[in-house]
Regions:
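Extracellular beta-strand ligand-recognition surfaces/modules
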Residues: 127-132, 168-178, 182-221
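A carbohydrate-recognition surface predominantly in extracellular/luminal proteins
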Residues: 100-112
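Extracellular carbohydrate-recognition regions
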Residues: 32-58
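Extracellular ligand-binding interfaces
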Residues: 112-181, 223-226, 231-233
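Bacterial N-terminal signal peptides
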Residues: 16-27
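Secreted extracellular polysaccharide-interacting domains
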Residues: 79-101, 116-117, 169-175
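Extracellular beta-strand elements of beta-rich domains used
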Residues: 40, 210, 229-232
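Short carbohydrate-recognition loop motifs
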Residues: 65-87
Length: 235
């Protein structure tokens, strides 16, 4: 079996599986009203560092931004790698997403390496390979902003909802956990309005930013993930 898997990998046949998984998302979005907030096509394949249209958020920590734009078939993606550091990028979506019209957030992602011992329930181990955040800034930002983070954690069980132990403005929703689906492209679909209501008890305003992160500094380990198109669409 090991030899077969190695031959399959070397053959390049696995490349055909990636666009199929990602194109499902693009096709679904085109079927109804949709807002594609990122599909990575504004960046050239092989481009490294912070992608066009995004800004880096260092939070006073080491941030390598070891990001690369890659392409499989017709679909582009962001490849994220982290080695004992924390990298976060933010994109302004002010005025682009109206949740009353497009409340469903869809995206595709893959985790390849999970930070060793990462656990969002503990401040000292809050390292995550794949993270996508929706941001509602409120003044003062550090105290009152509301941020929902959809994450692939190393150890925390799926469906766990937990407030960040580092900042009270972030609430994690664990969608994937552990190595069960490691190396697989998965498509996620979340009703942001329902998630917000469940957490805060009211209908949300329209979000003004999305954030992507990868970190491995707390556990002094490594992490790797990929993220494809990010889309808001109608129900």
């Amino acid at each position: 079996m090991q030899g077969y898997c190695l031959d399959f990998w070397r053959s390049g046949n696995w490349l055909g599986l990636v666009p199929a998984a990602l194109l499902v998302l693009i096709t679904a979005a085109s079927a109804g009203r949709a807002v594609i907030v990122e599909d990575w096509t504004a960046n050239r394949v092989g481009q490294r560092g912070i992608p066009s249209g995004w800004t880096g958020e260092g939070f006073g920590r080491r941030a390598d931004y070891d990001f690369t734009i890659e392409q499989a078939g017709e679909v582009r993606m962001l490849h994220l790698q982290s080695q004992n550091e924390h990298s976060t990028i933010v994109k302004d979506i002010t005025g682009k997403v109206v949740l009353k019209e497009t409340p469903i957030l869809e995206w595709s992602w893959k985790a390849s390496v999970l930070p060793k011992g990462g656990d969002v329930r503990r401040k000292e181990t809050t390292d995550i390979a794949a993270q996508l955040y929706i941001v509602w800034p409120r003044f003062p930002a550090l105290l009152r902003s509301r941020i929902i983070g959809y994450v692939w954690d190393a150890t925390t069980p799926v469906s766990t909802v937990v407030r960040s132990q580092k900042t009270g403005t972030v609430t994690f929703i664990v969608l994937r956990s552990g190595s069960k689906d490691l190396g697989k492209w998965l498509t996620e679909r979340r009703n942001v309005v329902e998630d917000y209501r469940d957490l805060f008890g009211e209908f949300p305003e329209n979000p003004t930013a999305i954030t992507i992160s990868i970190d491995s500094n707390d556990t002094q380990s490594a992490a790797e993930s990929f993220i494809g198109p990010i889309i808001f669409r109608e129900k």
